[in-house]
Design a protein with these regions (language model features):
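Terminus-proximal functional modules
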Residues: 4, 8, 13, 18-121
Length: 121
């Protein structure tokens, strides 16, 4: 009986401790254009510590001849470096959501939202 009571108390205190954790939240959004001939605008958007919007230019997926794999590679590098900087600053990647929008078959965007959290001090 004492063991069951002890286990119950441990479970209750760990649950309460987790429920009291307060988080800071930060979002980073990658918008990658799928407009032929590289005419679209692709950006990585976040906010700095002062609340100012920061836009990092990304390359468009398409050039005049089709998919530009070097641009895809460059965008992957920029996004990965940005995520690594967030980790270095104590942020944890909590959730990722992606979507695609296209008004017709020749244009559109890929959008990915990265939600980070950090425990408030």
């Amino acid at each position: 009986m004492k063991k069951i009571l002890a286990i119950g108390i441990i479970l209750l205190t760990t649950t309460l401790a987790q429920a009291q954790t307060k988080w800071e939240w930060k979002q980073m959004t990658a918008i990658e254009s799928v407009v032929p001939a590289g005419l679209g605008r692709s950006r990585l958007i976040t906010t700095d510590d002062k609340g100012e919007v920061v836009e990092i230019k990304l390359e468009n997926f398409f050039s005049l001849v089709g998919i530009n794999f070097q641009n895809v590679k460059d965008n992957d590098r920029v996004i990965t470096e940005s995520i690594a900087k967030m980790y270095d600053n104590g942020w944890e990647l909590f959730n990722t959501t992606s979507g695609v929008y296209g008004a017709d078959r020749s244009t559109g965007i890929f959008i990915t939202r990265y939600l980070f959290r950090k425990e408030k001090k």
